[in-house]
């Protein structure tokens, strides 16, 4: 059964593609509509309980709070793991800015949790070729952004013994055999149907999807998974990513059996919303929509106080009388992503929604938390030398 459904809907109510996220006018992203449209499955409480049983750890708050909310074949990955069979994690980053922002932390933070919980290898694809094709930047700029972004990623604490980070511009010859096999299985009509490409688009856009698909297959990494391993065709892949990346992997799942591999499994996150509201995601293309890991404490304070959309009352009196609408309040939404303490979050939600907490108070809590995360990350990043970066990106055997 094919999984290649169009990425955008015909009613133009919301547009969700790997390059554009826009909710219906006046609304927020409808995630259940995406689940129906893409054909994925909502993560159930039973699956979370199974996850905890297999790992022996409490589920990450991203799972408990429904931030990672949808999946393809996650149950099969847990079965695979319990059977002692090999699998690996794959995620990526398109380097389009000199620093990661908080939206980028979402998949990487969860991926690190998965690596630690399951003790499995991880490959991270840096799609500097994609950004060159889609953005107004030079190849030299994309290479520079890659270098800076990789240091940001390493500083999150990934295990150097189990992590391989690669740049497409440098590693493409290793991916190319699988890129060719994938490209032969997908025709022009399918690519246009999945991604919405137009005749006026550069041909590089049409040829890129197989490049993002190739790391799903273990023989793209013979230094990690030897080609003479009799089980190589049974090694599975789990991809933590935002749900806008799903079209790439629907395509990949459709053709996996034709090139002798297992379908990649996915676990999808919601978007980290822009400061201005839930209608789109935090984006490096709009600096006013994002808080960066390179921002100063004053910049963080200024962005949250000036730009974070509030669901609170317009005056102190209104807030005390009616409380805040948490469903539209960006400050509270950010805390659901970043504040790990469930009881503290519950207390904030109660006090803010009932008017016992003012907008300025909750924004200050967020400012302090964001600055704490940024300072901790800057300290870790300062220890990432070029030598450490080179090791993470070197072609070598991993220990797992």
Swiss-Prot record:
Please give the Pfam families that the UniProt record associates with this protein.
tRNA-synt_1b
- Could you mention a single GO BP entry for this protein? tryptophanyl-tRNA aminoacylation
Quote the EC number. 6.1.1.2
Instruction: State a GO cellular component annotated for this protein.
Output: cytoplasm
Q: Motif location ('HIGH' region)? A: 95-104
Q: Which PANTHER family match?
A: TRYPTOPHAN--TRNA LIGASE, CYTOPLASMIC (PTHR10055:SF1), TRYPTOPHANYL-TRNA SYNTHETASE (PTHR10055)
- Put simply, this protein is called Tryptophan--tRNA ligase, cytoplasmic
Q: Which organism is it from?
A: Dictyostelium discoideum (Social amoeba)
């Amino acid at each position: 059964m094919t999984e290649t459904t169009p990425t955008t809907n015909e009613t133009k109510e919301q547009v969700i593609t790997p390059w554009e996220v826009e909710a219906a006018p006046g609304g927020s992203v409808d995630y259940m509509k995406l689940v129906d449209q893409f054909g994925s499955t909502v993560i159930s409480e039973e699956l979370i309980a199974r996850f905890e049983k297999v790992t022996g750890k409490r589920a990450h708050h991203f799972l408990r709070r429904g931030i990672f909310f949808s999946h393809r074949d996650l149950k099969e990955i847990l079965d695979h793991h319990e059977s002692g069979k090999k699998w690996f994690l794959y995620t990526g980053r398109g380097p389009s800015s000199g620093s990661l922002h908080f939206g980028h932390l979402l998949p990487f933070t969860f991926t690190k949790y998965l690596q630690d919980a399951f003790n499995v290898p991880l490959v991270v694809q840096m799609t500097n070729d994609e950004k060159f094709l889609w953005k107004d930047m030079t190849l030299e700029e994309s290479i520079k952004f890659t270098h800076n972004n990789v240091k940001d990623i390493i500083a999150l604490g990934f295990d150097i013994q189990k992590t391989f980070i690669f740049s497409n511009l440098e590693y493409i010859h290793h991916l190319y055999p699988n890129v060719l096999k994938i490209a032969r299985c997908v025709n022009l009509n399918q690519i246009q149907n999945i991604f919405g490409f137009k005749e006026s688009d550069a041909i590089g856009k049409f040829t890129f999807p197989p490049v993002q698909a190739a790391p799903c297959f273990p023989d793209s990494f013979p230094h990690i998974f030897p080609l003479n391993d009799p089980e190589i065709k049974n090694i599975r892949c789990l991809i933590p990513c935002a749900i806008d990346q799903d079209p790439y992997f629907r395509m990949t799942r459709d053709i996996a059996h034709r090139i002798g591999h297992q379908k990649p499994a996915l676990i999808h996150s919601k978007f980290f919303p822009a400061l201005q509201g839930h209608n789109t995601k935090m984006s490096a293309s709009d600096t006013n929509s994002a808080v960066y890991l390179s921002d100063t404490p004053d910049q963080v304070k200024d962005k949250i106080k000036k730009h974070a959309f509030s669901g609170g009352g317009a005056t102190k009196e209104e807030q005390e009388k009616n409380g805040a609408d948490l469903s539209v309040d960006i400050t509270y939404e950010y805390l659901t992503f970043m504040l790990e303490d469930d009881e503290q979050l519950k207390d904030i939600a109660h006090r803010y929604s009932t008017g016992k907490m003012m907008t300025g108070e909750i924004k200050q809590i967020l400012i302090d938390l964001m600055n704490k995360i940024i300072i901790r990350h800057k300290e870790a990043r300062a220890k990432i030398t070029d030598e450490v970066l080179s090791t993470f990106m070197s072609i070598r055997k991993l220990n797992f």
